[in-house]
Structure formats: structure tokens, C-alpha cells
Design a protein with these regions (language model features):
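Bacterial N-terminal signal peptides
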Residues: 8-18
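Short, glycine/serine-rich, charged loops/turns that create anion-binding
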Residues: 14, 61, 268
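Short, flexible coil/linker elements and helix-boundary hinge sites characteristic
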Residues: 16, 71-72, 411
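Boundary at the C-terminal end of the N-terminal hydrophobic targeting segment
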Residues: 19-23
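Active-site signature of cysteine proteases
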Residues: 172-413
Length: 413
């Protein structure tokens, strides 16, 4: 996933214009009361901080929940905590090799996809956070701008091939940068008195990356076939099954209600995705009356009607009740249009682990983020079904979490 900071930088640059400021006015939400319908186990909320690594934090959180489910772990004290930076190191190394091989015709950045995590676990294994924290550069939380820039500078220099023949040293030098910032990837380590390699530890956890599938939903490829989603961070070209959006949501619901969590890739640049734990696909057209004569008399679309000017007693004036924002109605066609015109982009990776309803009866997905215990819900977001329908790039889930009818259509055993 590309860093959400890019979007924030654009917001900062444009916020000085009146039109933009009006269009992006903060969305008002009522005081929600959520009732949990289904909630599956997740590990603690982590903090990717100043790094573009949401993809690994979200996907490893998903893997941790899968290990909990597969092994029947009920004691939170025994929940696994895997090393994000082990995966980052392996992924960055392979990406650099491919970048040079393709003469630089490949996206090279900190961003990637959930499937990349499964690929690394399949090829190398996995290690606990306790044996590789990845924090070798003097900060308590990830701050990786320098590392990203140094890696890119090195790999671009190697790609230019100034000697007209690549030396035998460049791969070791590149790996040396990764080791300097993240620490060497352990070849052996001990857990509970037993020695493991990354691969044997993966196997001991009974986690099989080949048991997982990716789903997406776009019309520029045939349904019930696989294709590599055309986003820069999908540098491996991993493929997802293309299904109608109704069936993707049905698969998501089936997974959650049957004890599975889901890795979720989504656009988060909508004004209804807030830093206070909400993800609502707000119909911004309902806010275009701001400052108009209509608003003067009847109030904004998402508030109670305003009283007539000059008739209010300031001492008795009550704050208007904030109602549910109106959401866009998502169709298969609207999803495709927004993907094609870059209104839906590959922004952020998260983990969906539950379903809840608010006091108005609206359905939400419970989402674990990787921005620390921030916001009103301490690192948890509540995403409406409309938001998930409209803004999802893909989901990753266990194949047994799929409805049987969809498994049959895809030929998945």
C-alpha cells in the first residue's frame, strides 16, 4: 500500500483554497453506540509510525489471528507476535534484485501488498518479534524515511551499471544496508527452549500460505478469473480472483461470522475516513449547500433544520443534533469508474475482524489499524458496508472461509 502521507501532503498543499476547504470540511458524525454482532480474536494494535509498511503490519496481524484460530489459542498471553521487519527485509531484498534485473522498470518503495507477506512466509518462514525487532537505528518506533532513501539511491546506482558489468559485491552491499537498519535476519533462534529456523517455526505453527486466496472486484477483467491488480505496490504480480462485489462482500461476511479474520486493502482518502476511528462513504454532494441560503434556513443536510435568523435565544440555543451522514450507493459500475479515474487508489492495509451495528441499525466492519492506539476507539476503526463495497482494492482470507458456492465457481477445493 502506498503511504497515506502522500494524501495528507496534497491536502496541506490545497487547503488554502476556499473551494477545496469547503469540499473537504470535516464530516460530522453522531455519538455512536456500537453493538458487536461477531468479534474474532486479534493481537494487540501495533504502530507503523513513520514508515510505509501498513501492508506488513496488517497482514501479519491477520496471520497472527490465523495462528490463534488454527492452534485453538484461548489465552491472550499466549498470542503470537511476529516480526514485521523480518518480512520487510526479505521483501526489500527481493524487490531490489528484481528492480535491477528489470533495469529499473519496477516500482521501488516501502509499500507492498498482503500477498507479499504470504510469499515471504512461504519462501523463508517467520520469526517472533522478540528475535528481530528491526529497530537498529536509534528510535523506539519505525522511522524509515532515511532507510528508504538510502536503499533507493543504492539500487538506482546499481541499475545504472557504471562498470558495464555488475560486480559480485553489489548484492552483499545491498543486503548490508538492510542489515544495518533492520538487523540481520536470524537463521536460528529459540522459543520456549526449542530451536527453530524461520521455516521450521512456520511449520510448527501449522500455518500454510497456500491455504489463502485473494479476492477483488473490477469489470476490466472477466469475473471468476485471476488477474494481477494493476497497482504499483503489487510488484510481484500476485494474482487475485475477480468476483462480483456482492460475492466479495458475501465472502467477507461469511468469513467473519465463521471465526475468520480478513486482510483488507483499501482506499482511505475519502473525507469519511477519519482519524477518530470512522470509515463512512459520505455522499459529499449532501454537503455542497454549506454557506448557501438553503443552509441559512434549513441547515446542512446532515443536521437538524436551522432556526430562522433573529428568532433564537442565545441562552437557550441547543447544539443541533448530528444525524447519520448520507452515504453513496455503490454499484459495480461506480466501483470501476472510481478505480479507472483514480478516485479509488491503493492506499492502506488493515485487518477486518468483526461486525457491529450502531444504534440506527447500520452495519459496520470492525477494523484493526496500525497507527497505534489512536483515535476514539484506541486503534480500531468502524467501516460501513458501503465504504467497504466502494473502496476495497482486495481482501485476503482462508480458502475455507469462502462460501461453498463461490468455491465451486472458482474451482477451489
Amino acid at each position: 500500500m502506498r503511504s497515506f502521507r502522500i494524501f495528507l501532503a496534497v491536502v496541506s498543499a490545497l487547503a488554502g483554497t476556499t473551494a477545496f476547504a469547503q469540499a473537504q470540511a470535516p464530516v460530522q458524525f453522531p455519538e455512536y453506540q456500537f453493538t458487536v454482532v461477531k468479534e474474532n480474536p486479534v493481537t494487540s494494535v501495533k504502530n507503523q509510525h513513520r514508515s510505509g509498511t501498513c501492508w506488513v503490519f496488517s497482514a501479519l496481524g491477520f496471520v497472527e489471528s490465523e495462528v490463534i484460530r488454527i492452534n485453538g489459542i484461548t489465552d491472550p498471553a499466549q498470542y503470537p507476535d511476529f516480526s514485521e521487519m523480518f518480512v520487510v527485509s526479505k521483501s526489500y531484498y527481493e524487490r531490489g534484485i528484481k528492480y535491477v534485473r528489470l533495469d529499473g522498470c519496477l516500482g521501488f518503495s516501502a509499500g507492498s501488498e498482503a500477498d507479499d507477506v504470504l510469499d515471504v512466509i512461504r519462501d523463508y518462514g517467520i520469526v517472533p518479534q522478540s528475535v528481530m525487532s528491526g529497530m537498529n537505528y536509534g528510535t523506539e518506533l519505525p522511522v524509515q524515511g532515511e532507510m528508504d532513501a538510502v536503499l533507493k539511491g543504492f539500487i538506482e546506482a546499481a541499475t545504472k551499471n557504471p562498470n558495464r558489468k555488475l560486480t559480485t559485491a553489489w548484492k552483499n552491499a545491498y543486503k548490508g544496508i538492510l542489515d544495518a537498519y533492520l538487523g540481520p535476519c536470524p537463521e536460528k533462534f529459540t522459543v520456549d527452549g526449542k530451536e527453530y529456523t524461520p521455516a521450521s517455526y512456520r511449520d510448527a505453527l501449522q500455518f500454510n500460505p497456500d491455504d489463502y486466496v485473494s479476492l477483488t472486484s473490477f469489470t476490466h477483467h472477466p469475473f471468476y478469473t485471476k488477474f494481477a491488480i494493476e497497482v504499483c505496490d503489487n510488484w510481484r504480480g500476485d494474482e487475485a480472483w475477480n468476483v462480483p462485489i456482492d460475492e466479495l462482500v458475501e465472502a467477507l461476511d461469511n468469513a467473519v461470522m465463521n471465526g475468520y479474520t480478513v486482510a483488507w486493502g483499501s482506499d482511505v482518502s475519502e473525507p469519511g475516513f477519519t482519524r477518530n476511528g470512522m470509515a463512512v462513504l459520505v455522499n459529499t454532494e449532501a454537503k455542497q449547500t454549506a454557506g448557501s441560503d438553503q443552509e441559512r434556513w434549513v441547515g446542512p443536510a446532515f443536521d437538524k433544520p436551522a432556526a430562522k435568523p433573529g428568532k433564537k435565544d442565545a441562552k437557550k440555543e441547543a447544539k443541533p443534533e448530528v444525524k447519520q451522514p448520507v452515504e453513496f450507493v455503490v454499484t459495480q459500475e461506480s466501483r470501476q469508474e472510481e478505480f479507472d479515474n483514480k478516485q479509488t487508489t491503493d492506499d492502506h492495509g488493515m485487518q477486518i475482524y468483526g461486525i457491529a451495528n450502531d444504534q440506527f441499525g447500520r452495519k459496520y466492519y470492525m477494523v484493526k489499524n496500525s497507527w497505534g492506539e489512536s483515535g476514539k476507539y484506541k486503534g480500531i476503526w468502524y467501516a460501513t458496508e458501503a465504504f467497504v463495497r466502494g473502496k476495497s482494492i482486495d481482501i485476503v482470507l482462508h480458502k475455507d472461509a469462502l462460501p461453498q458456492a463461490l468455491k465451486d465457481k472458482l474451482g477451489i477445493k
